[in-house]
Amino acid sequence: DFSGVLRRLEEKGTFNGITILDDFAHHPTAIKSTIQAVQEKYNGKNILNIIELGSNTMSGGFHGEELFSIDSLDSDILWLDHKSILKNNKGNIYNSHDDLIKSVLKNYSHFDIILIMTNKNSTNIYEPLRDIIEAN
């Protein structure tokens, strides 16, 4: 029996009122569609989107303007960009998991939904967030 594909908008759980979702983000078009789908499903909820540029294709800047257009969505987006290809002045780009987590922890309570999108293992983002949210 085939049980389906994991990490396609997988609900990891709700912790102290904040639902964490995990999605395997593999292409800018899919990321944009996922953000829009979550906005529709959780209409009226405050959503934090965390996007990690995980693959060489994503982190190498090969998607150009298509990747950067995601930032124009009416949404709160934090980028995890290990190779520093993204450039903006919004202060929402981080180069390490630790820096990203520290930023989220400063104001996570303002959000109802945290959507993690990466084509890498999301455990480095999900587990610290879950643990701290559960503890508070």
Which residues make up each language-model segment?
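ATP-dependent carboxylate-amine ligase
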Residues: 1-136
